Design a protein with these regions (language model features):
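N-terminus-centered regions that define maturation/targeting leaders and the start
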Residues: 2-199
Length: 199
């Protein structure tokens, strides 16, 4: 049977569609949220995060740009996974941070590290790995306004690392650029964020 260029395109269409669905998940509207929230500029992130992290606290899902309470997020997430696919191999790293310390208007201690997990084997279980910095939920001073809590996932350059060499000595003034330099990582391959406030 002779295949014309048109018939080849028809044969390839289902495969191409599924690939696009995995990689286009954070298209322009999603990158707009990262930009308008100020996270891209405040953390010097790329304009577009190619993947979205699905984060759950029990039955509660983190909705990007949504709001949760400190009580709802007091314990570590029960699930963090990537929606879609990436072009790097394990292991992976996950961080959660608050860039609004002590407040968004006066972030003199940007950022505070709330969680760090290294040497993760699967993008479907980014919460399972070597815990370099134990989880600490949102607990900012009452009256400091809404804080952004940001999850970011990175490739580790195909090598496992020692948590003692990567974890910072303190949570405050966490230098994200220094972190992925030590990790030999590039830009984050996925992220999510929510707001929380102590009334």
């Amino acid at each position: 049977m002779m295949l014309t260029p048109f018939s080849v395109l028809l044969l390839l269409a289902p495969w191409s569609g599924s690939y696009a669905e995995a990689s286009v998940e954070s298209s322009q509207p999603e990158s707009d949220v990262w930009i308008t929230s100020g996270i891209v500029s405040d953390l010097s992130l790329p304009d577009t995060l190619r993947g979205e992290l699905e984060v759950k606290y029990g039955d509660l899902s983190v909705v990007k740009n949504g709001t949760l309470t400190p009580a709802q997020t007091a314990e570590a997430p029960t699930m963090v996974k990537l929606r879609g696919a990436i072009n790097c191999i394990p292991p992976f790293a996950l961080v959660m941070l608050d860039p609004d310390v002590p407040s968004r208007e006066n972030p003199t201690e940007r950022s505070k590290l709330h969680w760090m997990v290294l040497n993760v084997n699967s993008t479907r279980k980014l919460h399972e790995g070597d815990v370099a910095v134990p989880y600490r939920g949102p607990n900012r001073t009452s009256g400091s306004g809404p804080h952004r809590y940001v999850f970011l996932a990175y490739c580790q350059g195909a090598q496992r690392v020692l948590t003692s060499e990567i974890a910072p000595q303190q949570r405050s003034n966490f230098d994200l650029a220094d972190f992925f330099k030590k990790l030999r990582a590039g830009n984050p391959f996925g992220g999510n964020f929510f707001y929380a406030e102590n009334a």
